[in-house]
Each structure stands twice: as structure tokens, then as C-alpha cells.
Amino acid sequence: MTISIVLINYNVRFFIEQCLSSVKKAIESSAMLRDKAEVIVVDNASADGSMDFLPPLFPGFRFVGNSENTGFARACNQGLRLCRGEFILFLNPDTLLAEDSLETCIRAFGPHTGAVGVRMVDGSGRVLRESKRGFPGTAASFFRLTGMTGLFPKSAYFSAYYRGELNENENHEIDILSGAFMLVRKSVLDITGGFDERFFMYAEDIDLSWRIRQAGFQNLYLAKTSIIHFKGESTNRDARYAFHFHEAMELFRHKYFRHHSAFVGFLIRSAIRFRELKARFNGPSRRNTHSHPVRRFWLSGDAGSGAECRKKLLEKNFMPAESETDAELIIYCEGPQCSWKSIIQLIESAPVKQPHYFHGAGTHSLIGSAFSDARGEVIEI
């Protein structure tokens, strides 16, 4: 078995449906991986009918249902124990892969490579800064938590957390990879162990990335393949987010910074508290909203998939727009004539960044997210 892909689902059945559809295409498109890949989905007690909805759609994938939400790290380790692959991919359910993403990443491994991550863009095509990160030392953490990184995004000092000085279009050896797409050699995980299960949510990817580095392996940011990561769907930035974020940062501080001076500890704790209060003050995550009683749509991509999508939208009283600029919903339809890779390239190269919606051939929904800190929207069709 070449690769095992582990996903954790929690009440995002339509987002993970689109994700699994793209994973299936990536496996089937690769001679290297066809019949040499396995997909394991651990469901953390979803209440949205995921475990009834998903298994019939993906009969070749393995679904494991938990009776309670055990947290991301523990569920990942649960999936890891079932893996038989030489490479393990930890993948978020709110992602869409290009058809060549898996093979490209596997081929990028050198003898000293421990893990590989990719260039990630949101649903509007904007590059996500967390695609490449440095170790969150004292100064880097403080500047990130207080928002200074946003003021100086290209600074090697103020934006050290996101390695802002590195060209996002080039490959780099980095400290920290994103858990949204983290491909790790299984033999490396045998040395480092999996995720630290004390992290219920957040920072577990930072911790594992750093342990891979400490074990003497390289973490590689690979710029030549891109994926979509909606991000907001798995990061609900409300009071609950603030609690788990604060909990994770306190654990991380204790694990890596407990020997620092009292003043340094005070700075880090203050920055964490500032971030928590900011999240609480901002309130619940924004939801994608629409301004027209009847929503106008514009379809691009595969003709066959688009025709089926158009039929379903008309049945739901959506209206076709006269032009793309007149549309409230710009929908990219994947299919034989338009791959996920070409769709990702289109939104990356678009001169104007705006929200898009996505539909995989044969799936039952459209998904999209207007903001990286907003919960996504699902239109069931």
C-alpha cells in the first residue's frame, strides 16, 4: 500500500462529500496510486447524518464512527492505527485536491524528507499564509497573536510565524506544515509518534511538525501543486473557538516555553489572552449571506456536470445570470471536460478575487465560503 489518507469528519457531510470526490479522482488519475491507496474517515459523532449519507457514495473507503467527539488529534491517531500505507496523509474535510496533488507530493520526497505540505488557497483563490510557517518562538508567537504579522506580511522578523520573506511560488524547507494537508512518511511517524492527544483542537500540527524536525527530518513546502482549503468551515471563530485556541496555546506554551523567563511567559500569556478576547468580542463567525430574494448563478467548467447542476438549481428557483458579473453565485463544475486542477488554476490566476462555489460531478451539493474566517455555505441539489 503506497498511501493511506485519514480524514476526520464532524458535521460537514457535504464539504467532505466534495473532498472525498476530489480524493477519489486523484487516486483514479494516478497509475502510481490506483489500487495502492486507502481512505479512512473517522466520524466524531456527527449529528448531520454523515454516517448514513457517505458510505454508500464511497463504497471503497473505510468509515469509522465514534460515539463521542474525541477531538481532532485523538481521531487522527485512531485512523493512523488502521493505516497500511508507506505514506500517511492527514487531510481536512474542507479541502479540494487537484488530480495530481498526491502523486506530485509523494515524488517530492527525498531521503531526508519527513513530511510534505502544499500551497493552499481559499475559495476565492487567495493564498493561505499558513501553507508555510516557522516555529512559533516567543517573538513570532507574540507578533502573530497581536496581529503584527498582518501589518508587515513580508517581514522576516514580524512575519516569522508565516515565513513571510519566502516566495510562496517556490519550494522551501520550513519548520511547520499545516494539518489541513500533511503528508508524512510512515517510518517517520513510527519514530515521532502521531499527534499529541492533549491537543483537542488547534496546534497539534505545529507540535507534530516540530517533532519531525527534532527527529532530524525535513519538512517541505511544495509550491508546484495547489489545493483549495475553505478553512472557515473547520475554524468556527466564536467563543468555543476562543476556548479551544486558548487551551491549545497554553498547552503549547507549557510544553515548549516553560523554561523561559517569567517576563517572556507573561508576554506570551498576554498575547494568547488578547487573541481569546478578540475572538469573543467578534462574536460568532460570519455566515455567507445573499442579498437577492432570487439568487442568480453563472456556471463554468464541465458542460455535462454543469447541465445537471443547472437543472437542479432551476428546480430550486435559482435564476441564471445574464453574465458572470451579474451573478451572485459563480459556480465551477468539475467533470471529464474540466478537472479540479484546472479549476484551482483558474481561481488562482483570476485578477479579481471573489468567492466561488464548487460542484464535483455526481455529487449532491454546491459548496463555497466567502471568507477565510466564515462558515461555508452548502446548497443541496
Segments the model singles out, each with a brief description of its role:
Residues W210-R286:
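Active-site-adjacent helix/loop segment of glycosyltransferases
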Residues F135-I174:
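Short, flexible, basic/aromatic active-site loop/helix in glycosyltransferases
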Residues I88:
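Short aromatic/hydrophobic "clamp" motif used to bind/position activated sugar donors
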Residues S22, D43-D52, E68:
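A conserved acidic beta->alpha catalytic loop
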Residues N167-E170, D175-T225, I347:
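A short, conserved alpha-helix in the catalytic core of glycosyltransferases
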Residues G65-C83, T104:
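Glycine-rich, basic loop-to-helix element that forms the pyrophosphate-binding segment
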Residues L7, V12-A31, A307-L314:
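Short, well-formed alpha-helical segments that are part of the catalytic scaffolds
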Residues L96-E130:
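Conserved donor NDP-sugar-binding/catalytic core segment of glycosyltransferases
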